[in-house]
Amino acid sequence: MNFQLNGRALRHAPTPVRRILHSSAFIEGWAHYAEELCVEEGFAAGDPRFAVGVWLEALVRITRLACSIGVHSAGMTVSEGAARFEADTHLSGPAALSEARRATFDPTYGRYTWGKLEIMKLRDEARRQWGAGFTLNRLHAALLNLGSPPLGLMGTAIVRG
């Protein structure tokens, strides 16, 4: 769904640069944000399994970000990363070890959470700046009109929105 919505927005982006260049952190962050937004907006509210699934995956994704940072800048070992996955998520044994190993060769696998957190920060800022004029539709339209921007340029959505 995130690729469909983002893909549709990309086809209508106002410039060729915005239609062609893509930020994986934005795309994956948008997907993670949309999952959480579904819970916030009450999707499947009568079935707690949906929310539990979203939160379980969020734990895996935030642990990926922590391990990626740990392995690449704080001297975390693969064994320590696997232990972190076992302590903080539902993963254990080979699954936890596989996730920890991934941090050694894919330093961007934390981009899901990073992108989501930046979008949520932007949402809070838009709410603050736009006041009573804030709506999710307005924010999402302004954001998707940028195409698939690098995270550092998402703030222009507030100015243009």
Language model regions located:
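N-terminal maturation segment of proteins
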Residues: 1-161
